[in-house]
Amino acid sequence: MCKVFENVNTGGVPLTVFELVTATYATRDFDLRKDWVQCRNTICGFGDTLRTDLFDGIDETTFLTTVCLYTSYLNKQSGKTNTVSCKKKDVLGLPYESYIANRDVVLSGFKIAKEFLLRDQCVFRQRDLPYTTQLIPLAAICAVLGKSKCNEPNTIKTLSRWYWCGILGEMYGGANETRYAYDIEDMVEEVNGRPNAMHTINSAVFSSTRLLTLQTRLSAAYKGIMALLYKEKCRDFMNNTTIDIVNSMLESPDIHHIFPEAYCEKMGIKRERYNSIINKTPILPATNRSIGGNAPSEYLGAILKKVDGLTENELQARVESHFINYAELKADDFNGYFIDRAKSLLNLIEKAMNKPVTDRDAENTLDQFGASLA
């Protein structure tokens, strides 16, 4: 019945997958919509002692798709099916019995996934989450492995590499159902030390010139690189704060220019350069106000005067925690600083993906940067 009436209802309004499954489960005297409200409260952590909005963007279809992916994986493992699949038709056909049997373990998978992101990846807020779509395989993988296995160092290392390859390789921007199936099979096998194709890890590529086109937080890779800076314990220039789950909620750092926009415009620096992620970093509001539109040499001096007891050596350490060359910044040497920071960000990306950026000295890189990034 669901498949027949998938496209229109009696009013001619398209029905969502969730509405169709809700109608099917209603024949079993089960209110899926009411159940989803309870599931959403659990996923979002309403009532938690320390709650962030990280998972507030997860909707009912995302949750159903995750339950379907987990169920399909179990079915293949038990020999009931030959493939893992969570496409629209599979979600529509998710049996009521399977939903009831697997819902709670998938909810636990989301909880484990949230801990993984908050604790291990320094992704704290919904606005900083690179992909909501990647949470589907992540939660399903965590549900299969369980909390104890997910907390093992080798598991964290394996899942971290997969997670960052997916983000920095920008692998989850389109139709992803086939990738989800690869991911759950590959990662469970990899964690358990068995051969697998590692589709997402092996397919992920980061190009050096992508740094120039990462200009806004609309990009997953842009958000990802900022999270990597948090993960590396970058410290605020003025108050020395590192960004953790508590500070991200209390002080809400934002992403600002290192060489200020007004200064760059005055100096004739191209927007393609000064507005790229290479010239941006997480900064607290008070520090950003102190920076203003001034040259770095001016605002560094102003910060030293403003913060009691702050030595230049300490300020240098704070600045360099953002992978910024302090000497070049203090000298207002935009070109030297820009190339140096591009290299440092590529090093950070290579570390997260555990694979090399292969075009650091390619002709296209040389053309666009005017120097090798090797």
Regions from the PLM with identified roles:
Residues 276-308:
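Short Cys/His-centered divalent metal-binding micro-motifs
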